[in-house]
């Protein structure tokens, strides 16, 4: 018996030895190559088996029984590139971030969807793109990076913003701006109505209150499948902003320091010097008044201008400077146990190119979330305080703007100061006097923005969850404007005028959703969401003014020192929105996808007959590369076809547009009286946009990625503020008058040219072609203004004016087409016919660029471009082409017609312009084509073996240039071919170029 037992034990040990010889224990750690931090939750799988593990809190893993025959581990993690590595006993694996994988998740505001199952059209911009830009507004980072995005901003003044189109202008007269959603909450941008816009004609930019350093990603939602869930506010697209949250892993501190300067980008407005200007003025004065040329020259030089005949004064140079730029950001990010946190602090101070214009912003953000076994509780919050100094940028001009005064009220013969050192030409709007820090003009805006978004989510198990979110957005603005006693507005003897504008916008949103995610039979996935939302918007506004500032000469320009009231104004407004919505997604075998959404909105903005509107979408997608005939294809690695159709709405008009109002204060015979100020319209209803999109996504070799979209968007019941007859006593009223259509193509390519451990080289490009057309107009006549016309069958931004042909080389007179056919010409401006002479919107726009990394060196070069649009420069007609005695452009001074120079480029300059050479015509309509070097960045990251000794995880130094240069059409006259929405520019704030150097530190 004893011998049998010994034999049994011997066999057992031999068996164990054989098994041990056939398996092995593999341990290791997975870290991020980007910051050296552990990658928690990464999947580690033995290739070809079911043996695997998930990395722990230190990025560690253990595989106790790996077959000895196994050679490879497959390691994967969302946001990282999947790697296959050879098996060793103790392993350390560095995972690289996958920018392509970042696109695999689409944030829709109400939730997150896998891009593979997403049937809509969307584009994602990550934090790396934002980090390269210096603009206070994060939206500028989308220009050239996202197809379908058109920026309309003709100024580089800090803190001033224009507008943005997503797939063209979608409305005639109501809001054209996309809906902004920040961390799931709609935010009131309202750059069209009820905005933070005052008589300075500058739109104070509410989005510049959000620090780009706090943003994780921006998702642009375009078609109906992506936007219909937002119903009545989604006609112009949706921009979803996701801020940074607590990250897995240990505590990180990130510091980013940027400093630099702001200078002129490029200049297409070269003004003549004093000698050139005097010759042109004398030519023009002699042509108008007659007499001897030299005697006229002497009169103008000595008596009219008092010129010393040798000095030449550059007024644009006098009001310009090299502005200082500084941007500091500190954030702390991590997760302790079940609690994640992100704390961000930022300070931005940027001086504008023109003296007296600047922006200063303090910002803070706190995002917290705590995860329980069955629930998540969190809050996203931010605060910012912004101070902006500037002046009017109206296309109508304002002599109280130093920029306007410099180019339209001064000449190079006018000195800056008189013989006693005081400001010269004080009665002719000396811009230096306007900018005097002690006694000059003031235009300061202070904006406070508070966002508070607490949320609570319960997970019931089996894919069922419920979430409630409260959003509070408060935007408060105080703006003070002081008009110097030297330059009283409206020619009134005010002895100084101070105007205080205060407003407060509050938006409270509460939404509740319940969702269900379910998978059955291994091939069927379904997700369902039902939701309800309520929103209340309130707007408070007050204005008061005073004059008579007795101590203004000593620098006391505060309203409390003024003596005479000049009026006041006060009002409050409210608007409410109630909504119910549903969203469903289904997929089969991860190849066929269907989606649908429905939303019912009720808005207080519209008439009692049309308070409620229904909006919906359907979408489908086929992943062709998942079929058997392509599954083994190593060249075509992804091919998908998608399509969507649906309706969305637009309610961005004056909140009380459908109601009739009366104003008091109109007394008669000492009896109190009132008069109607608006006409009620109970039939006023939503604009409804029907959106169709078909798209194709294609990838080759997992390196070349192509996306193509065709879209057709038609807006009906377009809202427009119609002028009324003077006999009504009311100037305008809103009506639904027509339809507008945008049809276009989007194309993008992203390719990895070289990809290995040391060298990575990528290239991207995108292109958008869009055609805008007014397809229906219910008014009796087209709607015409000074420069443009809204007419059925033409683009919304159609220029309509007398068409300039050239000059009569025998007489020097300007010529225009006499008739609409364009087969006859005339030198009589009044006899010339108006013609369609171009469209303000570009036909094609987009961007392209490349980025390269080699070991620790990184290099980025980005461009954006426009082709086909027109720009009208009304300021050039008033100034640069010699109207009256205003400084001409150098080219005009040297190349205007004279009897001795009959082959000249420009018509004869004649004082007071009797030939209407500077009247409105296509003479001042220029090509808006341009190619801009939007960003160049060069950086170097020190090796971790150096920095870790100082407890620094990452140290990167870099230099960057924004808007390095803009190549324009040869005939363009202006500082910037990028215009406001109507394509008209005048007295532009010069385009700026920002040079910065920076350091990024991660501890």
Description of each model-found segment:
Residues 176-177, 182, 193, 248-312, ...:
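Surface-exposed loop/interface segments of Gram-negative outer-membrane beta-barrel transport/assembly proteins
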Residues 10, 331, 369, 762, ...:
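Conserved C-terminal beta-signal and adjacent last beta-strands/turns
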Residues 148, 158, 342, 854-874:
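Glycine-rich phosphate/pyrophosphate-binding loops
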Residues 243, 330-334, 364-370, 452-458, ...:
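Residues on the lipid-exposed face of transmembrane beta-strands in outer-membrane beta-barrel proteins
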Residues 1-365, 369-371, 376-380, 451, ...:
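Short, small/polar-rich motifs associated with maturation and membrane association
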Residues 608-612:
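Short glycine/threonine-rich loop-to-helix capping motif typified by GTGT followed
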Residues 72, 117, 150, 250-254, ...:
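Membrane-spanning beta-strand positions in outer-membrane beta-barrel proteins
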Residues 150-154, 228, 625-632, 945-948:
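Active-site phosphate-binding and catalytic loops of NTP-dependent enzymes
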